[in-house]
């Protein structure tokens, strides 16, 4: 990912004392508090809040041992402002349709076992059929969405998809408050190891758990957005884009995807290990799916 984003933290890390206060319990809750605050800040988009949170978690994970003072510095307004600028520049190099393409694959991968068992058919069958349709179109035409989109606007399936995706994102944005509340609930419920409430686990275990849970939350968010786009694309013909994405549909797909991603911690780790080249992603991949 962007070296500019990486440079933001060099000063903090170089000044970091090794006289670490061993209060991992306190720091886990402190980190969660800051991430909840980011997701609750309506001046920061949902995507920006997720990207910033994951970047900081990665930095904390890489620079153990950490102190509460270092955590506070990472989440300070000055540092966040610098990070936001760097992330905006880095994110601008990723095509939104590359994001679409990757999320289309994530949705299909996540749904495989549920479809085999005949679960959630009412919700999954239409959107997975649509997802597979797009995958076949791009494969048959040799179109890679991210690379070829600009050259094909309005001229073929890929160009039509680009137009639809932009329309959908406008409709999707009207449910920002609902999505923020969902993500804040996921962070509050899942970001901290249950052991924190009974004992103090090792700092490394805490931070790794936080990173993995943030990856899992990102998958859930990306798959909710993708499934809603595919459902919307089936329903939007002949009616205004906003009307085709109603509250009940959004809520229903959020509930279904939440159930589909409601894994135990060990199962989440297993899924990530089996589905990705590295257990812990680099920031660039997180940015790709967000």
Task: List each language-model region with its residue ranges.
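Single conserved hydrophobic/aromatic residue that forms the stacking wall/gate
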Residues: 1-5, 9-12
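Intrinsically disordered, low-complexity regulatory regions of eukaryotic transcription factors
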Residues: 10-41, 52-59
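Hydrophobic, aromatic-lined core segments that form the binding pocket/scaffold
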Residues: 42-290
